[in-house]
Structures are given as C-alpha cells and as structure tokens.
C-alpha cells in the first residue's frame, strides 16, 4: 500500500508541477520570447507553430524530468517493480517525448488554423476535428506506438495449448480475433507488473498478454484475465466510452474557450494597469515588454501555456466523471469474464479471485483505497470490490441467465 500511496501523492504533485511550469513559462515571458524568435526565423505559420510547440514542450518535459525520473525509475526500483536499466528508461522517455512533440505539432496546426478561421467557434470545430484524430490514433496505435516500447510475438509460438483455450473461449463469446493477433509481450524486460490488454479497433484489434502474467498466473487464471479483456470488445466498450468521453470533452472545450479568453483579457488589463502605475523609466521598459510580449488573443502562439493551464485544470476537474465511466465498464468486463469462462474453466470464481489476489500482490496495489481516492483517481473498481464480486457472482449455480454474454448491448 505504501507504493500506491506514494503514487497518489505523486499524481497530485505532477498536476501542480505542470501548472507551475506552464505559469512560469507564460509569466516569465519565455513563451512570448520564443514566439518572437520563431517569427523571425520563418514567415510561414506552419513552421512557426512546429518550432514553437517542439521547443516549448521540450522545455516543459525538461523541467518535469526530475519528477518523471523519480516516479518512473527510482520509485519502481525502490519497491522492486522495475527490471529496467537506466539506459532503457532514458530511451523510452526520449521516445515518449518525440511522440508527444509530433502529435502536439499536428494538433497545434489544426488548433491554430481553426482559431484563425473562427475565433468564436474554434472550440466546437476543434472538438469535431478531435473525433477522427482520436479514432485514427486508436487504429494505428498497435502498429506504430506499441512496437516502439516493447517486443511482441504470437502467443501460439510459446503457449500453443493456452492459445487453443483462448480461441475456444473467444469463440464462445462470438469474438473473432485471429490467432495471429493474440500476442505475448516481453514486459519482463522492464517490469514485474502483471497485466494484459486489448488495443486497436476494427481490423487492428488485438489481444496482448504480458509474459509476466504467463509467469505468475496459471492457465485458468490467465483465461479469466483474457475473458475480462475480451469483454471490452464484445460489450462495445471502446465506442461507448469514446462517445461518453467525447460528450464530456465537448463541454470541457466550451468551458476552456471561455476560461482562456477571460484569462487573456485579464492579463492584458493587468499589464495596462501596471503600465499606468509606474514611473516614466519603468513605464518605458514595460511598454517595450508589452509591445513584444503581450498575448493579445488565443491565435497568438504564446497563448499555448494558457491553453495548457486551462486544459489541465478542466481535465483534472472532469477526472471523477471520466473515471466513473471507466469503472462502470471495467466492472462489466469483470462480469463478462466470469460468464465467458464458465464452461471453459472448471471453477471460474476461484480462478478469478486468485488472479486478482496475485495481481494485487505483484503490482503492490492498494486493495481498499479511501473513497476520495477511488472517486478521483481509480479507473477500475478496487481490488477488494473485484474480489468480492468474483467470489459471489455465479448465476449458473442459481439457474439464472448469463446477462452480458447473451445480451452484450
């Protein structure tokens, strides 16, 4: 539990640090100065935006790197969760930064183009644009992003008998994932954590089992984990959660639009008031600063730290709603995993309970977090809740229908 509690503290510390960095890069004049430099470098708006975003995000990540290092490397080694060397960790950190910069540049091009075209409705148009962008990322992630960090091989090469059982169980669920897209991931090269997941959508969907899971769980326990992951596809959780989240983000974008404009207006008013209060010598310096560094509207590249401050705050405040939706779907997937394993695993309840116990022990999970932490941070039900449900949900023993397996919608 000590590890989980440290992560809770680090989560809130990371939010505070990010906000502090954005505010510093805004109020110190760094963002405005960088905007002036990229304008002098190129007259092309696309080049200006690309350079500004790349340099700005590299500066942000550099300032965040001590916390990244402590959280992602020191803490996990201290508690015996990581097997990753420092060179590998730094390489992953750099690759993550590179991906972040590339994606951010593409988003910035869309964002600032829409702001320029429609200063009053850019929030709505950017929300529309975010839908195909997010869908495209979901589809290409298994092919482009995941292989940058881990190696994958078909599960049937190392676990043919388990693959046969998985295929039988997936067929029982009516889920068509070819054997060629059921993978084993070499997680043990970096971590001792036990996990499995599904990724992709449509023709890119695939099931991935970590090699640490295969090492720590037996065949029946692994099937319950796989059944849970299969439930996300059969129960259409990906499109459902996507739709719910997009509705929330529509509201967040509008709130963000109002907040960004208000902050910029207040900032300009504050600068003008400051100019009027100082003596002539200081006033001339402030005027020089204001002419070059004042942020007039959101179309200004130097508004990026303000945009990020607002985005961070509104997403943080929306976390309980977003995570509540996720917990609901994760509970459904737990239920589906038990139902689909019935008839394939001799005692699905015992296997499921054991799998949760082992994962909680290996991953150093907090089995029963405080109500506030659960409400604000947890995307899954707590371990205690999941074990309690796994031990008691057995409709087949009571002659009741299998709700989710028979009615996946």
What are these regions (language model features)?
Residues 1-268, 294-298, 312, 316, ...:
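Polar-ligand-bearing catalytic/cofactor-coordination segments
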């Amino acid at each position: 539990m000590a590890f989980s509690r440290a992560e809770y503290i680090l989560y809130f510390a990371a939010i505070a640090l990010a906000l502090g960095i954005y505010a510093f890069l805004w109020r110190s004049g760094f963002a405005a100065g960088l905007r002036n430099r990229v304008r002098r470098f190129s007259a092309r708006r696309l080049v200006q935006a690309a350079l500004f975003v790349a340099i700005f995000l590299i500066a942000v990540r550099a300032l965040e790197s001590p916390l990244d290092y402590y959280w992602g490397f020191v803490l996990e080694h201290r508690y015996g969760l990581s097997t990753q060397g420092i060179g590998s960790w730094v390489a992953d950190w750099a690759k993550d930064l590179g991906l972040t910069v590339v994606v951010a540049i593409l988003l910035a091009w869309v964002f600032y183009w829409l702001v320029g075209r429609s200063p009053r409705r850019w929030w709505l148009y950017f929300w529309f644009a975010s839908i195909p962008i997010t869908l495209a990322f979901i589809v290409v992630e298994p092919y482009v992003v995941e292989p940058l960090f881990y190696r994958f091989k078909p599960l049937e090469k190392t676990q043919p008998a388990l693959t046969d059982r998985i295929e039988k169980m997936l067929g029982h669920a009516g889920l068509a994932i070819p054997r060629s897209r059921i993978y084993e991931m070499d997680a043990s090269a970096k971590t001792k954590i036990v996990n499995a997941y599904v990724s992709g959508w449509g023709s890119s969907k695939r099931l991935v089992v970590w090699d640490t899971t295969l090492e720590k769980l037996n065949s029946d326990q692994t099937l319950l984990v796989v059944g849970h992951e299969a439930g996300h596809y059969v129960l259409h959780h990906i499109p459902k959660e996507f739709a719910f989240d997009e509705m929330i983000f529509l509201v967040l974008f509008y709130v963000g639009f109002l907040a960004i404009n208000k902050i910029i207006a207040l900032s300009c008013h504050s600068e003008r008031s400051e100019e009027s209060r100082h003596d002539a010598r200081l006033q001339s310096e402030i005027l020089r600063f204001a002419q070059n560094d004042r942020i007039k509207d959101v179309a200004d590249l130097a508004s990026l730290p303000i945009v990020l401050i607002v985005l961070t705050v509104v997403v943080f405040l929306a976390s309980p709603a977003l995570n509540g939706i996720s917990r609901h779907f994760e509970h459904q997937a737990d239920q589906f995993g038990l139902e689909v394993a019935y008839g394939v695993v001799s005692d699905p309840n015992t296997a499921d309970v054991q799998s949760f116990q082992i994962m909680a022990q290996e991953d150093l999970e907090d089995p029963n977090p405080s109500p506030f932490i659960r409400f604000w941070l947890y995307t899954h039900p707590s371990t205690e809740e999941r074990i309690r449900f796994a031990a008691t949900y057995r409709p087949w023993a009571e002659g009741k229908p299998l709700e989710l397996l028979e009615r996946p919608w």
